């Protein structure tokens, strides 16, 4: 057995008809976890329904439909392999929870693949004021997806087909707008493809002999190649934040007979191990960790990404709950957030947001109403320039800096300190109306909390 490949997550973004499904379907189909039987079944159905031309998208639509209906389909279907990586597609933007998932960090993408359609008129529609191309790219940037690949799709439908002039025209335009939102075009591969016919997907295309390949320059090393698959292989794998102080947002707290209180959650940063003295915020309860378990096996130490249960001494189920954050009491312990400033993007709010608006925020596992206490400034979402300060209102499409005050105790962190605890979705009227990234937090000084005996002994 060789060394297991590194796992990376990608998110595929772009305008509604850019061909995301076909492109993604093609990768999964050719390099992925779908077995031949399933593919043949899908193909036969597609043929019978006269959808033969949608072969790859059809594969994806079937998966999506099953996922939408809540059938837990084999998750391997959303994975494929490159020479270096196991790649998981964490979400397709057509999926209604896409934005919420990106923010609440069920999924942090390592790289965004931006698909743009190159057909006559298609690119222009996607990148227009109302198109989703810019919005998705801005969202990826705001949520801290640092790497990007641009797939210039539908090269087979340019005039004339596979036109070099059209490709150049499009990448000039895309470079200009992604630069405005904060990406450096020199670090981004631009690949002309046909997701449907397979040009430059896995093998270099004979139809675009003019294309000399993509190349990127970055501090981790330069890279070049010809295909989309090679571009995916050049993603810089994420550094797991093991060396940061512990942050573990609780998903649940169980009371288990004969054992006691067992909080459960995913380690986001740092490590947790038996014997450690931990503090739960915002409750400010300090205690000792007796044992740490994953998949019913006890662990000497759990690391970022691990979903664990751990047993704590002398803490009742009433003391802590879902949304509490577990931290190392000796290393930058988590504290209650009295207020915080955030950059927000208003997505689909029917009216306008003004001071006093109090919707529910989903941040890590917490779900708590927070008041927009003050709108500090408005930012043009296309240029990132300040427009008017302080604005009276923010409406759909606006971005701004706001001050938020939780209505109940809450623990969040600045995005730059602890990214998974620094992104949030604003929920109202059963939908995501805005997303945000936390710039700074005013914390409670944390005096006068409950400390159990065993924790006090260890101090």
UniProtKB/Swiss-Prot annotation:
For the region G2, give the residue spans: 70-74
Region called G4, residue ranges: 153-156
Q: Spell out the residue ranges making up region: G3.
A: 91-94
Q: Where is this region: G5?
A: 194-196
For this UniProt record, give its keywords in alphabetical order, as a comma-separated list: Cytoplasm, Elongation factor, GTP-binding, Nucleotide-binding, Phosphoprotein, Protein biosynthesis
Instruction: Report TM segments.
Output: none
| Any single GO CC term annotated in Swiss-Prot or TrEMBL for this entry | cytoplasm
Q: What is its main location?
A: cytoplasm
Q: Name one Pfam family in it.
A: GTP_EFTU_D2
Q: Where is the tr-type G domain?
A: 5-242
Subcellular localization is given as: Cytoplasm
Q: Which residues carry the post-translational modification 5-glutamyl glycerylphosphorylethanolamine, per the record?
A: 301, 374
Annotated region (G1), positions in chain? 14-21
Q: Which family does it belong to?
A: Belongs to the TRAFAC class translation factor GTPase superfamily. Classic translation factor GTPase family. EF-Tu/EF-1A subfamily.
The record, for NCBIfam families, names: EF-1_alpha, PRK12317.1
Q: What is this protein called?
A: Elongation factor 1-alpha 2
According to its UniProt entry, this protein's organism is Oscheius tipulae
Gene designation per UniProt: eft-2
């Amino acid at each position: 057995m060789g060394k297991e490949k590194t796992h990376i997550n990608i998110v595929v973004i772009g305008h509604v008809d850019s061909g995301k499904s076909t492109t993604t379907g093609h990768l999964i189909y050719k390099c992925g976890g779908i077995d031949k039987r399933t593919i043949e079944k899908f193909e036969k159905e597609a043929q019978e329904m006269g959808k033969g031309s949608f072969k790859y998208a059809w594969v994806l639509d079937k998966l999506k439909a099953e996922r939408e209906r809540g059938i837990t389909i084999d998750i391997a279907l959303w994975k494929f392999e490159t020479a270096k990586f196991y790649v998981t597609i964490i979400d397709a933007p057509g999926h209604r929870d896409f934005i919420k998932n990106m923010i609440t960090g069920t999924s942090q993408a390592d790289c965004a693949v931006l698909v743009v359609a190159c057909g006559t008129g298609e690119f222009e529609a996607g990148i227009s004021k109302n198109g989703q191309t810019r919005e998705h790219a801005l969202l990826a940037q705001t949520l801290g997806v640092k790497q990007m690949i641009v797939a210039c799709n539908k090269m087979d439908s340019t005039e004339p087909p596979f036109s070099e002039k059209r490709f150049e025209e499009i990448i000039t335009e895309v470079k200009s707008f992604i630069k405005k939102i904060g990406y450096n075009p020199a670090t981004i591969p631009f690949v002309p493809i046909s997701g449907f016919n397979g040009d430059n997907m896995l093998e270099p295309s004979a139809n675009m002999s003019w294309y000399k390949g993509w190349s990127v320059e970055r501090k981790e090393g330069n890279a070049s190649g010809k295909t989309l698959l090679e571009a995916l292989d050049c993603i810089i794998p994420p550094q797991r934040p093991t060396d940061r102080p512990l942050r573990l947002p609780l998903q649940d707290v169980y009371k288990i007979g004969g054992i006691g209180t067992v909080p459960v959650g995913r380690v986001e940063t740092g490590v947790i191990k038996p014997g450690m003295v931990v503090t739960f915020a915002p409750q400010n309860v300090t205690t000792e960790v007796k044992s740490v378990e994953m998949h019913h096996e006890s662990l000497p130490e759990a690391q970022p990404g691990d979903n664990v249960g751990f047993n704590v001494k002398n803490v009742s189920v009433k003391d802590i709950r879902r949304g509490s954050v577990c931290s190392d009491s000796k290393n930058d312990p988590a504290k209650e957030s009295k207020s915080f400033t955030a950059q927000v993007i208003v997505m689909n709010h029917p009216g306008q947001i003004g001071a006093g608006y109090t919707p529910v925020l989903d941040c890590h596992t917490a779900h708590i109403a927070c008041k927009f206490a003050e709108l500090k400034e408005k930012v043009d979402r296309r240029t990132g320039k300040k427009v008017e300060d302080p604005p009276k209102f923010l409406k759909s499409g606006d971005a701004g800096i706001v001050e938020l005050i939780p209505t109940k105790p809450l623990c969040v962190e600045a995005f730059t300190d602890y990214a998974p605890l620094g992104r949030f979705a604003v929920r109202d009227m059963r939908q995501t109306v805005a997303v945000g990234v936390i710039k700074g937090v005013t914390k409670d000084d944390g005096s006068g909390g409950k400390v159990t005996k065993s924790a006090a002994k260890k101090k």
